């Protein structure tokens, strides 16, 4: 097997091959309240990671992330994918955390569910949170994880 460069790659490789997603507690001592979801395969690593998943895989990925977030923080959850320019790990991952109050900015895209979450095409990140029965998706930013409790 090819040697991979980051700790998240190694974490994914420790898991059974049949698991499509891996949940890990963020190992940073500065982020004690954060979790991460990673696709187990390395096929999504690198630039434009979500574009490398099929629509069905992406919907399942987002459903799993939202399920974990709701289990941890009820309706106060947020998900954040940092953009290509600021991502510090090569293995694709999304931050799962408690959404900070008062961070809603601009005009988010409002979607009905995980299957409708768009794929950033320009290397930017996105962050997502619930709004009633729908989701607010914020696009066009690089550093998105700052909307989550550390």
Task: List where the protein language model places each region.
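HIT superfamily nucleotide-processing domains
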Residues: 1-150
